[in-house]
Amino acid sequence: MKYDGKNAKNGNYVKQDSHNSHSSHSPEDHERLLPPRGDYQTLLSFQKAEVVYDITFRFAHKYLGRGDRTVDQMIQSARSGKKNILEGSKAALTSKETELKLTNVARASLEELLDDYKDYLRARDLPVWDKNSKEALYVRRLGRKTPQTYELYREFMDTRPPEVIANIAICLICQADYLIDQQIKHLEKEFIEQGGLRERMTRVRLAYRNQKQS
């Protein structure tokens, strides 16, 4: 399996064609010890999280007061969401367990950030958009464009009031959460079916031993 940011409906990844095992001549052809992973930058979940970070950094510094601890908290949560997806993708080469753990940390960090944005609106008696409102549906359509970059949303950051920007961030976080949830389900399934590095090492050794005996 390889993650691909262009295929969100399939859980942020696409299935690649496998080699015909009957034509293999070495254990490495049957199973790679370190399976390939796609570039984390192609992950749609990472792209969304990076946009959320860029929006949050600007939002917090522009609309929250100096000395407000929420500034650092929101920026750190946004950064954690982005960085843990990145680090999880890199860790995938050697440890599915670590990849799964870091991806879960990313999910939890974005959930904290989501709560901070909702707190901002609630404390000021400002509405959170209904998920089926025309505004939310517009952001959802914008969220289907690939790649997802801050430039898609820059105009809103420059021209819209803070309550609109906060709601856009909420929409994007919810989209990122959905993608990460699909990613986690895939990782859990992959771990159950294939195990981690230790299991792969065992299978490769057995395949090599069987080949020498045949």
Question: What is the predicted role of each segment?
Answer:
Residues 1-214:
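Amphipathic alpha-helical assembly/interaction segments
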